[in-house]
A protein has these predicted regions:
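PLP-dependent aminotransferase-like
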Residues: 79-145
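Short beta-strand segments
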Residues: 10, 74-75, 99, 121-122, ...
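Active-site C-terminal subdomain of aminotransferase-like
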Residues: 194-223
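Conserved N-terminal alpha-helix of the aminotransferase class I/II PLP-enzyme fold
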Residues: 34-81, 88, 102-103, 110-111
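A glycine-/small-polar-enriched, mobile loop at the entrance of the PLP active site in fold-type I
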Residues: 5-56
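Conserved active-site segment immediately N-terminal to the catalytic lysine
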Residues: 170, 184-195, 204
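Short acidic/polar capping segments at secondary-structure boundaries
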Residues: 103-104, 123-127, 150-154, 174-177, ...
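Active-site phosphate-binding strand-loop segment of PLP-dependent enzymes
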Residues: 12, 112, 124-177
Length: 223
């Protein structure tokens, strides 16, 4: 029975290429002759290890991620990073700069306040988040600067990476990752919920500079 193709233009989940859907469908019960579905195999098996390594390699190649940065595939949705980032990056100074230019950056700043001091580097709420501020006010005490690259609700997007004078940059790229070239080396951490531009919902991609390891707070859970 034929059916009319439905085109989804919502903010997420994103549409999948038909070739990808067909390939996934054909292998749902027997992945590459293994006799089992990917959903059934052990995550510690060599075959799943190959899937994981290939996925990582393809993303590293697509974004030209340097060896200085690690790629993580995490659970919990992108909003989990609202807490995970300050818990792991605020450090002993417990201070961070946040650019509030939309709904999600505002929520991220509010969550970060639970773990330390949040300095608002810029705020576009005075005009309904209809613009990206041209200037930043950075705190000398902050350990990183946070911003959301593309604001789907308000329709604004940062056209270039903000100049933070060397301060670590953290960016939520959930809605524009893989849409254009990005110099990953400029960022301490990039994260993105997979469902808008990359894959089905349920996965968050984090790309983090290995040099930032070891800054976690004592209260950071071991998960």
């Amino acid at each position: 029975m034929s059916r009319e193709k439905v085109y989804n233009f919502s903010a997420g989940p994103s549409m999948m290429p038909e070739s990808v859907l067909n390939k996934a469908g054909s292998e749902i019960s027997d992945y590459m002759g293994s006799g089992m579905s990917v959903m059934e195999m052990s995550h510690r098996s060599s075959l799943f290890g190959e899937i994981f390594a290939e996925t990582k390699r393809k993303l590293r190649d697509a974004l030209n991620v340097p060896d200085s940065h690690e790629i993580l595939f995490l659970q919990g949705g992108a909003t989990l990073q609202f807490a995970a980032i300050p818990l792991n990056l605020m450090g002993s100074g417990k201070c961070a700069d946040y650019a509030v230019t939309g709904n999600f950056s505002g929520l991220a700043a509010k969550e970060a306040e639970k773990y330390g001091s949040v300095h608002i580097a810029c705020d576009s709420s005075d005009r309904g988040h209809s613009y990206i501020p041209s200037e930043l006010s950075l705190s000398a005490a902050s350990s990183y600067f946070y911003y959301c690259a593309n604001n789907t609700i308000y329709g604004t997007e940062w056209q270039s990476v903000p100049d933070t004078k060397g301060k670590t940059i953290v960016c939520d790229m959930s809605s524009d990752i893989l849409s254009k070239p990005v110099d990953v080396s400029k960022f301490g951490l990039i994260y993105a919920g997979a469902q808008k531009n990359m894959a089905p919902a349920g996965l968050t991609v984090v790309i983090v500079d290995k040099a930032l390891a070891g800054r976690q707070m004592d209260i950071c859970p071991s998960v």
